[in-house]
Amino acid sequence: MALNNVSLSSGDQRSRVAYRSSHGDLRPRASALAMVSGDGFLVSRPEAIHLGPRQAVRPSVRAESRRVDGGGRSPREPDGRGRSRQARFSPYPIPAVEPDLLRSVLQQRLIALGGVIAARISV
């Protein structure tokens, strides 16, 4: 199959692509590829090309209100340290581990392990 399409991304053929596209000589697939690859200005009509400066995009009101409300990064304390992190709200209760329960479970396991070791030594 012969390739009749010109390469739209190589810099040395841009003038040829612009000439062919301005005369409507590009195939629909080639022009679609140019649009997707960012070379759409090569496919558009010469009078449709605007080389002026882009207008600055106004930040959204939501982003501005977040800055006003103190969202984003938390301000630092006067001594340079960041504020301590607050725990996130969770609808599920966080189980509190009772130290006595933990101590008794660990003690039982230690006694059981000691019994196994003593049994192996005695054999």
From Swiss-Prot:
Family matches, as InterPro entries: DUF4687 (IPR031487)
Compositional bias segments (type: Polar residues): 1-12
Annotated signal sequence range: none
Top-level taxon of origin: Eukaryota
Protein name as annotated: Uncharacterized protein C11orf71
Database matches in Pfam families: DUF4687
Ranges where the record places region Disordered: 1-25, 53-91
Native species: Homo sapiens (Human)
Biased composition annotated in UniProt, kind: Basic and acidic residues: 61-82
Segments crossing the lipid bilayer: none
